[in-house]
From Swiss-Prot:
Gene3D superfamilies the UniProt entry points to: 2.30.30.100
Gene name tied to this protein: hfq
Ribonucleoprotein among keywords: no
Record's subunit section: Homohexamer.
Originating organism: Saccharophagus degradans (strain 2-40 / ATCC 43961 / DSM 17024)
Protein name: RNA-binding protein Hfq
Pfam family, any one: Hfq
Lineage top rank: taxon: Bacteria
Taxon lineage: Bacteria, Pseudomonadati, Pseudomonadota, Gammaproteobacteria, Cellvibrionales
BP-aspect Gene Ontology terms: regulation of DNA-templated transcription; regulation of RNA stability; regulation of translation, ncRNA-mediated
Entry keyword set: RNA-binding, Stress response
Domain Sm: 9-68
Length: 86
């Protein structure tokens, strides 16, 4: 996993696992709403009444409907929260 994905992947994974409704704003201003069904390096699969494949390069902002706690990882893959008592 590249360094650029050290926050993005865990964040999207929490949204997916907890089925948190999100609003995704695209760079052209369009707002999409739904739940993150899946994602990879290039796309996010957003599910509402239908599934939409949204290319990450077109995404400006992801806004969850409630606060999200993301488990941060150290370079070796261990949880930073474990060491800090979090």
């Amino acid at each position: 996993m590249s360094k650029g994905h050290s926050l993005q992947d865990p964040y999207l994974n929490v949204l997916r696992k907890e089925r948190i409704p999100v609003s995704i704003y695209l760079v052209n201003g369009i707002k999409l709403q739904g739940q993150v069904e899946s994602f990879d390096q290039f796309v996010v699969l957003l599910k509402n009444t239908v599934s939409q494949m949204v290319y990450k390069h077109a995404i400006s902002t992801v806004v969850p409907s409630r606060p999200v706690r993301v488990p941060l990882l150290n370079a070796d893959g261990t949880s930073a929260e474990d060491e800090n008592g979090g």
